[in-house]
Swiss-Prot record:
Record keyword Cell cycle present: yes
Compartment(s) of residence: Periplasm
GO biological process, one term: cell division
Protein name: Tol-Pal system protein TolB
Gene: tolB
Entries under Gene3D superfamilies matching the protein: TolB, C-terminal domain, TolB, N-terminal domain
Family as reported in the entry's similarity comment: Belongs to the TolB family.
Region (Disordered): 406-431
Amino acid sequence: MSLMTKLGFRALVASCLITAGSAANAQVNVLITGVGSTQFPIATANFTNEANLPQQVTSIVRADLARSGKFTNIDAGSTPVPETASVDLGAWKAKGANAFVAGSVNRDANGQYKVNFILYDTVKQQSLGGLSLTATDTTLRTAGHKIADYIYQKLLGVRGVFATRLSYVIKTGNRYQLQISDSDGQNARIALSSTEPIISPAWSPSSTKVAYVSFERKKPIVYIHDLPTGRRYMVSDQKGNNSAPAWSPDSNTLAVALSLTGNTQIYTVNANGGGLRRLTQSSSIDTEPFYSPDGRWIYFTSDRGGAPQIYRMPAQGESAGAAQRVTFTGSYNTSPRVSPDGKLLAYISRTGGGFKLYVQDLQTGAANAITNTNRDESPSFAANGQYVLYATQSGGRNVLAAVPSDGSAPPQILSVQGGSVREPSWGPFMQ
């Protein structure tokens, strides 16, 4: 959510229902709108014994690879090829595939599935190994995502993020839903449904909890939702506004923005709701905190220089060292997010009457716009730092978009039929 929206919180009457185990009716759909300049050609043969499965693992793998923008799927025909088959790698290379995947899905006596596959490098004429996974009817999609992750890492040298999850807020009519889904928008579940706004979801680094802000008690309050149990609990209900939760790397602490004493300032609170501590001591508005992955710094938005810019301070607060300005490109910058490796800063900059997603190299200070949209907000890095998820507008609708963090390909649009989707947060690698 934008800085000005966060600073203009209104008290709203709420009616809220927790539905942790409910399947989502409104589901995010992915539209592949562009690909990278260089794509890796790969052929994924149909896995054996897939005909009557509730989920086609092969289709999930192919879709993941295509969605990444890093691969092009070479037609592998309709004949299933098990991982145990003897494969003519030269023939597949001649068809234009630099890699080939074969596999099988077998159901055991307990009703579980054994998913096996092997990955070949057709150029070097060698096996790159594979996995043997156990799945159920409900986790076959996850198995497909894990296979795609394996392929991505083996061929590109970077860990894949297909088996990670997203959180976002869908608004349909007068109802808001906080949803949790797979990285492709499928398998969506409703964590919270309310007639009042839900904003600022934030994943814990442990991948088991999501913090968010709900207006259900006539004011913004910070809650934590425990995903394994479906239980949620209040973390910050201080006087005034409670907003912008951000997790520490150890998942034990949240940085929050509170208007407890008037102007919004940065505080920390234990994940159990205790131990409130003030970090900033300015007469300006300090908001939108975000921890660096090493836990040393907190980045935040402040107008202490006259207009919103990104600053950083020691994680212990300004008492341990003065805040330092980080952004110098543009006169209005908000919504800091640091990449998982600590090298990049994503933020939103007001540019030419619109708002665009920028990425800055934290070592050199070089910053560039990486999108072709101009109503951007709420950036969130993928766990491998290769992509940034953000909210924007497309065709007059509120949608999500994912773009390579180097801006090398156009955004892929994630939309919902009959509604709008905002407030994205890309989850960490699954524990």
